[in-house]
Amino acid sequence: MHTINSDLRNTDPDISFLINQELLRQQTHLELIASENFASEAVMEAQGSVLTNKYAEGLPNKRYYGGCEHIDAIEQLAITRAQTLFNAEWANVQPHSGAQANFAVFLALLNPGDTIMGMDLSHGGHLTHGSPVNVSGKWFNAIHYGVDQTTKVLNFEQIRQVALKNRPKLIICGFSAYPRTIDFKAFRSIADEIDAYLLADIAHIAGLVACGAHPNPVPYCDVVTTTTHKTLRGPRGGLILCRDKEFGKRFDKAVFPGNQGGPLEHVIAAKAVAFGEALKPEFKTYTFQVISNAKALAKRIQERGISIVSEGTDNHIVLLDLRSIEMTGKKADSLISEVNITANKNTVPFDPESPFVTSGLRLGTAALTTRGFTEKAFIEVADVIADCLLNPEDLSIKEQCKAKVIDLCNRFPLYNSNQ
């Protein structure tokens, strides 16, 4: 007879085994995917709680279901902490993802066929910023700006000219693979010139923004969206922020009933825990270490003769341009995976290769910094990556690299306290 009191190992040994295998993989690999991080055990405890049982359509104290008094308190804590963290007057913590946060903004501000302007995906933008394969590029007239061909950084006069020519109703500033600081004030000036809304998608840099390691878009943008994982180190989910409470009500309605039903209150509780962690001084220390580590990683890789897009980084992202060593991103990704390093192939600006092959490799320092890596350890990581990429056919070097990775994993253990 089935009982809800049976644990996972007894109820479903197959899933239990696979979860433990994934834990082992995370513990024995170096995680350099820029969009990933390691949530705390407290965050995971909240997400795996009895809150998963509760339906709570609506907002705190305005629900369509009974029995929400504790849910209301939890969600209000998440809202208040998010407002404090980002100095925002309004927040909605219900979006299931960053993509759904963006769609809620589109629903609130746009009509099908309106013109939107975002960063070109191949230059570091995101699918939801108007890519033709995404609903944002199918429902709206999407135009794009990119980086300067020489410097590989944003050229605001070029962006201004694109905006003046096309006069979009919404400008999106944000990225998934841009390693430099975003000047939100400059974007605001362009948006004001054409009377456009301005959306900042800070999914990758939210943790940096929260701690003052990157400028805050809230004072300059009409609305801000983000994920709650990545550099914020929370559960996988979305968040919408706004500097004006009345304007924010548009997005409340766009989230529910606009494009979601019941919120995931177990995830919202985990968001609240993560926001609470991010408000502590040690998280600020962590965030600045993330950036220092990225700079050390980029510098060492350049010293080994591999080019870096824009010649460096201001955040957690290091984007390798592998044309400098006549290698594709697909090949590089495969090589480092053989020595237990996970990253991802990525297009670089003006990439001659297809998105399935690419000329780039995107690295991020957030996850390994959570494990305790500092600059010295990241120099070791850079050398392992360079050794792999510069000696693709040397099996002895490959074995040495894998041994170094295992040593680094042992020196900086993950989730070892209760395992």
UniProtKB/Swiss-Prot annotation:
<dbReference type="InterPro" id="IPR015422">
    <property type="entry name" value="PyrdxlP-dep_Trfase_small"/>
</dbReference>
<dbReference type="GO" id="GO:0030170">
    <property type="term" value="F:pyridoxal phosphate binding"/>
</dbReference>
<keyword id="KW-0963">Cytoplasm</keyword>
<dbReference type="InterPro" id="IPR049943">
    <property type="entry name" value="Ser_HO-MeTrfase-like"/>
</dbReference>
<keyword id="KW-0028">Amino-acid biosynthesis</keyword>
<feature type="site" description="Plays an important role in substrate specificity">
    <location>
        <position position="229"/>
    </location>
</feature>
<comment type="pathway">
    <text>One-carbon metabolism; tetrahydrofolate interconversion.</text>
</comment>
<feature type="binding site">
    <location>
        <begin position="125"/>
        <end position="127"/>
    </location>
    <ligand>
        <name>(6S)-5,6,7,8-tetrahydrofolate</name>
    </ligand>
</feature>
<comment type="subunit">
    <text>Homodimer.</text>
</comment>
<dbReference type="InterPro" id="IPR015421">
    <property type="entry name" value="PyrdxlP-dep_Trfase_major"/>
</dbReference>
<dbReference type="InterPro" id="IPR015424">
    <property type="entry name" value="PyrdxlP-dep_Trfase"/>
</dbReference>
<dbReference type="GO" id="GO:0005829">
    <property type="term" value="C:cytosol"/>
</dbReference>
<dbReference type="GO" id="GO:0035999">
    <property type="term" value="P:tetrahydrofolate interconversion"/>
</dbReference>
<comment type="pathway">
    <text>Amino-acid biosynthesis; glycine biosynthesis; glycine from L-serine: step 1/1.</text>
</comment>
<keyword id="KW-0663">Pyridoxal phosphate</keyword>
<feature type="binding site">
    <location>
        <position position="121"/>
    </location>
    <ligand>
        <name>(6S)-5,6,7,8-tetrahydrofolate</name>
    </ligand>
</feature>
<dbReference type="InterPro" id="IPR039429">
    <property type="entry name" value="SHMT-like_dom"/>
</dbReference>
<dbReference type="GO" id="GO:0019264">
    <property type="term" value="P:glycine biosynthetic process from serine"/>
</dbReference>
<comment type="function">
    <text>Catalyzes the reversible interconversion of serine and glycine with tetrahydrofolate (THF) serving as the one-carbon carrier. This reaction serves as the major source of one-carbon groups required for the biosynthesis of purines, thymidylate, methionine, and other important biomolecules. Also exhibits THF-independent aldolase activity toward beta-hydroxyamino acids, producing glycine and aldehydes, via a retro-aldol mechanism.</text>
</comment>
<protein>
    <recommendedName>
        <fullName>Serine hydroxymethyltransferase</fullName>
        <ecNumber>2.1.2.1</ecNumber>
    </recommendedName>
</protein>
<keyword id="KW-0808">Transferase</keyword>
<dbReference type="InterPro" id="IPR019798">
    <property type="entry name" value="Ser_HO-MeTrfase_PLP_BS"/>
</dbReference>
<feature type="binding site">
    <location>
        <begin position="354"/>
        <end position="356"/>
    </location>
    <ligand>
        <name>(6S)-5,6,7,8-tetrahydrofolate</name>
    </ligand>
</feature>
<dbReference type="GO" id="GO:0004372">
    <property type="term" value="F:glycine hydroxymethyltransferase activity"/>
</dbReference>
<comment type="similarity">
    <text>Belongs to the SHMT family.</text>
</comment>
<dbReference type="InterPro" id="IPR001085">
    <property type="entry name" value="Ser_HO-MeTrfase"/>
</dbReference>
<keyword id="KW-0554">One-carbon metabolism</keyword>
<feature type="modified residue" description="N6-(pyridoxal phosphate)lysine">
    <location>
        <position position="230"/>
    </location>
</feature>
<dbReference type="Pfam" id="PF00464">
    <property type="entry name" value="SHMT"/>
</dbReference>
